[in-house]
A protein has these predicted regions:
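Auxiliary, metal-adjacent structural segments of Zn-dependent hydrolase domains
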Residues: 2-58, 120, 124
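Active-site oxyanion-binding pockets that recognize sulfate/phosphate
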Residues: 2-6, 65, 104
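Short, polar/charged, Gly/Pro-enriched helix-capping and turn/loop motifs at alpha-helix termini
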Residues: 26, 89-90, 128-129
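Short pre-active-site segment immediately N-terminal to the catalytic Zn-binding motif
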Residues: 58-75
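Post-HEXXH active-site segment of zinc metalloproteases
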Residues: 69-73, 85-116
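Short active-site segment of divalent metal-dependent hydrolases/proteases
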Residues: 76-84
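Long, well-structured alpha-helical subdomains associated
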Residues: 123-131
Length: 131
């Protein structure tokens, strides 16, 4: 694992967590955060990016062959899932798991919220440094 990349990720994850706290985005107790450097093919579209496991309160980010910004965007997406699990834990108990989104309206709702909020959180966070 590239120590510089890991150090940078850890730094920015800490900064994002501070930001979440500042804006009142509820994620505590924090999940265990795992940076997984399992090799990902460089030119493969369908690689694993990350996941949140509510039963273990664990968030895994796959970091090999990925830009730091992309990894942090995944982190924000998965932290929205953490927030969803805090605000409405039954949501996860009732979700359709690994079904295709076209067949899983509850999962589609959960994922839609995570994509929308996760990207907005990350954009607003980055704007603190660019505007």
């Amino acid at each position: 694992m590239n120590e510089t990349k890991t150090d940078m990720l850890n730094y920015w994850i800490e900064e994002l967590l501070k930001y979440f706290n500042e804006i009142g985005f509820e994620v505590n107790p924090l999940p265990k955060i795992v940076l997984d450097d399992t090799p990902n093919p460089e030119d493969e579209l369908f690689i694993k990016t990350g996941y949140y496991d509510p039963t273990e309160n664990k968030l895994v980010l796959f970091i090999d062959n990925r830009h730091i910004k992309d990894i942090l965007r995944t982190f924000c997406h998965e932290m929205v899932h953490r927030n969803q699990n805090i605000v409405n834990p039954r949501q996860f108990e009732m979700s359709e798991g690994d079904m295709p989104l076209k067949d899983a309206p509850k999962l589609r709702m959960i994922e839609g919220e995570a994509f929308l909020k996760g990207n907005l959180l990350f954009r607003q966070f980055t704007e603190r440094f660019t505007h």
